[in-house]
Amino acid sequence: MKLLINSKEQIIVEKVLSLLRFGKQTTRYKDVFDIYYLISYSIDVKKVVKYFECYVFNNENFEEKNMKDVSDSLREILYSKRIYTNLKLKEYNWLNISVDVIIKKLINFFESI
């Protein structure tokens, strides 16, 4: 039996996809911390961009057409009152890192690629 595992890059894109799809209505708060954790380690940025091109930029169901759009959408979602408040709850923050630090790193990461 063979076990197939998604790459870190694909996991990042899938988690961001979920945030973009549900926007301010998301309940997947732990995904924000997972994404932070994954981008904190060595990843292939070219693969991340490639996956975004495949799953987001070329998909008419998403408004985002480039990485700037992605970072702008994430900023709007993550700083919305309900999401930001819930991200501060200890039950979701398994990294025990400041939510502001996490959000800034996510936005900076996606702005930089």
Regions found by a protein language model. Name each.
Residues M1-I113:
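Structured mid-to-C-terminal alpha-helical surface segments
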